[in-house]
Regions:
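Non-catalytic surface loops within mature trypsin-like serine protease
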Residues: 3, 21, 30, 110, ...
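A short glycine-rich, aromatic-capped structural motif
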Residues: 1-52, 72-75, 144-145, 152
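Residues within well-ordered beta-strands of beta-sheet-rich folds
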Residues: 23-25, 83, 237-239
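Short, surface-exposed beta-strand/loop micro-motifs that present aromatic residues
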Residues: 15-16, 25, 137-139, 227-228
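Functional-site microenvironments in short loops/helix caps that host divalent-cation chemistry
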Residues: 2-6, 50-223, 230-232
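Short, structured beta-strand segments at or near domain termini in extracellular proteins/domains
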Residues: 231-242
Length: 242
């Protein structure tokens, strides 16, 4: 897990993780699947008002039945998965599904992305499973591009640097927000003095998105946002214990 070369600081160092058995959905959650949860009056109806929608062609460009649900928050993603008797994936589980055991750079291997393998560098999502050439080592689809996928874990920029049994385990909300503020003050890992001081724990997302370039699709790449954020490029896929 992680990367020693070609990654961001929060991906260092590469390290081995042992996981219990788990299941991960083959595809991202679709609009039509999420709407069944809305109809059951469990999930929140989609809100078309978003500051990022018009930039990419308006809400209608993202709402076909088989496109992945987007503009969904971490809390809403968690509610949906729990409705199905599932849960959000953990960061290590997601990376295992995307990389297998050979530390590949992308789900399909180490070759650079192209249009047959991922939905990226564009202006809208595509139907889930539309890039079978980009399948991961266990057959999962769209793990590089389409939408970022919310994960259970709190984002901790220092998690991989811990030693022993604590490696990879995020700290408490208070510890993590303090660490992020330190990075903000130092201008490290993409933070600058103008970045706002965190006011809530951020959660991890993985997998790249339709509007990201090729390097952003690396399977070890870690992205993070506050759990309440609804971004046009954020979606979900569910997991459950094995």
């Amino acid at each position: 897990m992680g990367a020693d070369k070609g990654g961001q600081e929060d991906e260092h160092p590469a390290h081995q993780v042992t996981l219990a058995a788990f299941w991960l959905d083959k595809t991202e959650v679709t609009n039509e699947a999420y709407e069944r949860c809305v109809a059951a009056k469990v999930c929140r109806p989609h809100d078309p008002k978003s500051s990022q929608l018009n930039k990419f062609g308006g809400d209608e460009a993202f709402r076909a039945p088989r496109q992945p649900i987007s503009s969904i928050s971490w809390e809403e993603s968690k509610t949906y998965c729990q409705w199905l008797g599932k849960r959000l994936p953990r960061e290590a589980e997601w990376e295992k599904a995307a990389r297998g055991t050979d530390a590949r750079r992308y789900p399909w291997g180490n070759d650079p992305p192209d249009a047959t393998r991922g939905v990226y560098a564009g202006s809208r999502t595509a139907e889930v499973g539309s890039r079978p050439a980009g399948a991961g080592p266990y057959g999962h689809l769209d793990m590089a591009g389409n939408v970022w996928e919310w994960l259970e874990d709190i984002y901790d920029p220092y998690a991989y640097r811990r030693v022993g049994a604590d490696r990879g385990i995020p700290g408490s909300c208070e510890e993590v927000m303090t660490a992020q503020n330190e990075l903000r003050q130092k201008g490290q890992q993409g933070y600058t003095g103008s970045n706002p001081i965190p006011t809530e724990c951020e959660r991890n997302l993985r997998g790249g998105a339709f509007n990201y370039d090729g390097p952003g699709l690396r399977s070890s790449n870690r992205v993070h946002h506050p759990a309440s954020f609804r971004l046009i490029m954020s979606g979900v896929r569910c997991a459950k214990d094995g």
